[in-house]
Regions:
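Short coil-to-helix segment of the ABC ATPase nucleotide-binding domain corresponding to the Q-loop/switch region
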Residues: 89-96
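Conserved ABC transporter NBD signature motif
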Residues: 64-74
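Conserved signature/switch motifs of ABC ATPase nucleotide-binding domains
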Residues: 128-131, 149
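Helix-to-loop junction immediately C-terminal to a conserved catalytic motif
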Residues: 56
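Conserved ABC ATPase "signature" region
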Residues: 100, 107-125, 176-177
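The feature captures the beta-strand-to-loop junction immediately N-terminal to the Walker
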Residues: 41-43
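Hydrophobic anchor residue at the start of the ABC signature
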Residues: 79, 143
Length: 247
């Protein structure tokens, strides 16, 4: 077993609201290993996105702490529900934005951007603007942008929630293949049981607010995963177990 990449200890998040205190996360404890894919599930309001934002450094915890195994903060890529692309920038320009921010030289930036465009299957759309892309293509651009600086940790906040069912399922396969190629540590918030089981190595289920870990389930399914695995008896058993924990 790998050493934990992330350790969360007694982490709580509270907000003052209308003269009262709203506790979103309550003394959360968990460990996550490097190079694994985690799905984070639970009822709406259970603190899934809040935890993601804390790990990304976007908001602080109220109490408790989280640490990274290497002793230093990893580089992080994040993808939200909406692609949040800059509408005036082409596919190429949107993807290479993190390299521009980090002042990567032009030759290296062009090479990395070209490789990433090929990896996410957008060859031929390099000069397209976001308005000319389908929802699935826009999310591929967002994922490519998050991956281009080779982050240690990829955080995904329901990245496929706004897509139609068929596109969403195709994106599962594409993301699974991307993970297989890169083996990054991924934490994904989702409400979909099938999505969790198809993509993740482990599924963490949070309780109703205030969020605590209710279930930590290993997804014992072989990789690489193909669409057909969703119709196997083992997949069905895991789905039933997971549904019971969420309900």
């Amino acid at each position: 077993m790998s050493d934990p990449m992330i350790r969360v200890r007694d982490l709580s998040k509270r907000y003052a609201r209308g003269g009262e205190t709203l506790t979103v996360l309550d003394r959360l404890n968990l460990e996550m290993e490097e190079g694994r894919f985690y799905a984070l599930m639970g009822p709406s309001g259970s603190g899934k996105t809040t935890l993601l934002r804390i790990l990304a450094g976007l908001i602080p915890p109220t109490s408790g702490a989280f640490t990274f195994g290497r002793g230093e903060e990893p580089s992080i890529g994040m993808v939200f529900q909406q692609a949040t692309l800059m509408p005036w920038r082409t596919v190429t320009e949107n993807i290479r934005l993190p390299l521009e921010v980090n002042k990567v030289d032009e030759t290296t930036a062009l090479k990395k951007t070209s490789e990433m465009i090929e990896l996410v299957g957008l060859t031929g759309f390099e000069d397209s603007l976001p308005r000319d892309l389908s929802g699935g293509m826009a999310q591929r651009v967002a994922i490519a942008r998050a991956l281009i600086h080779d982050p240690d940790l990829l955080l995904l906040d329901e990245p496929f929630a706004s897509l139609d069912a068929m596109t969403r399922e195709r994106m599962w396969t594409e993301l699974s293949n991307l993970w297989q190629a890169r083996q990054k540590t991924v934490i994904m918030v989702t409400h979909s049981i099938n999505e969790s089981l198809f993509l993740a190595d482990r599924v963490l289920v949070l309780t109703q607010r205030p969020g605590k870990i209710k279930m930590d389930m290993e997804v014992d399914l072989p990789r690489p995963r193909k669409d057909e695995i969703r119709y196997t008896s083992q997949f069905g058993k895991l789905a039933k177990k997971l549904r019971g924990a969420i309900e």
